[in-house]
Design a protein with these regions (language model features):
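Residue-level recognition of oxygen-bearing side chains
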Residues: 32, 152, 255
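Active-site phosphate/pyrophosphate-handling residues
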Residues: 36, 172, 254
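A juxtamembrane structural motif centered on a specific transmembrane helix
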Residues: 230-263
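Hydrophobic alpha-helical transmembrane segments of multi-pass inner membrane proteins, especially
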Residues: 1-136, 175-233, 260
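Transmembrane helix boundary and interhelical junction motifs in multipass membrane proteins
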Residues: 73-78, 154-157, 168-170, 187, ...
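TM-adjacent membrane-interface loops and short helices in multi-pass inner/ER membrane proteins
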Residues: 129-170, 174, 183-185
């Protein structure tokens, strides 16, 4: 319902409907619903995993993803999709679901490319940001400049110019960190994030209760995949998705959701 409300009444940011305001306070429902989404999937998959159960879980996951796609929030749609596919594989141990998910993701990527103009712009900027560095390639070019300028040890606090990157507090915070604190600091940050993910996986592995096991795995997948999308986009490893870096990027909805996940 909340995702549908954003689709109808949400404000458009960078071509996507991500949030709506209540009494002047902006909310991004897709962030909060991640937790409920994982809990529901864990509950369904912890019961008897019949074909009907799997079908119903697939319908629910598809409904969430389709609403997000309609809102043009493709980064969140990708997180929801990947989380479902991996959780389904963990619950059933059937490789078919992974292969099917990969095929579906490839088809969805091609379809999104032709349906959404901002996706085509991001793909073009990712392929070669230098061809239009003053316009479509400006963000990713400035991001790479910032990382390169910071080098291994960084330029120092307030010594860089991260403000030259549009939306640096939300989408490009990793580049700003590397510019001022250095690539080594960025590597340490990634190592901390990975260690947190591995701890979540360990907790899930030792859980004997299926519901808690799948819920832990699901929240861990959401966390690490969001980090992958953000840092991958900042470093030009993958196209930009507009996803925030958990606990680091500016954004109350993202920070609060991540805190609730760890709680």
């Amino acid at each position: 319902v909340l995702l549908g409300a954003v689709l109808v009444t949400g404000s458009i940011i960078n071509g996507s409907k991500l949030s709506f305001s209540i009494l002047g306070i902006s909310f991004q429902p897709s962030e909060f619903i991640k937790i409920l989404y994982v809990i529901f999937l864990a509950g369904v998959l912890s019961e008897a995993r019949s074909r009907m159960t799997i079908f119903l879980s697939a319908v629910l996951a598809a409904a969430h993803v389709l609403v997000l796609v309609a809102s043009k929030d493709l980064g969140s749609a990708l997180i929801y999709s990947i989380t479902y596919v991996i959780l389904l594989y963990i619950a059933t141990r059937k490789l078919f679901f992974i292969l099917g998910g990969m095929a579906g993701a490839a088809a969805a990527s091609v379809l999104s490319y032709y349906l959404f103009s901002h996706v085509r712009v991001r793909i073009a900027a990712w392929q070669n940001p230098w061809t239009d560095i003053s316009a479509t390639g400006y963000q990713i070019a400035q991001s790479l400049f910032a990382i390169g300028t910071g080098s291994w040890l960084g330029m120092g606090i307030d010594a860089g110019s991260p403000r030259s990157i549009p939306y640096v507090e939300q989408d490009f915070i990793f580049s700003a960190i590397c510019e001022e604190y250095g690539i080594l600091y960025g590597i340490c940050l990634v190592a901390i994030c990975v260690s947190l993910f591995l701890e979540i996986v360990h907790i899930a592995h030792v859980c004997e209760e299926p519901f808690l096991k799948y819920a832990s795995y699901g929240l861990g997948i959401v966390y690490i995949f969001q980090i992958f999308l953000t840092i991958g986009g900042n470093t030009k490893f993958i196209p930009l998705t507009g996803v925030t870096l958990p606990l680091i990027s500016y954004g109350g909805s993202s920070v609060l959701t991540t805190m609730l996940m760890f709680a």
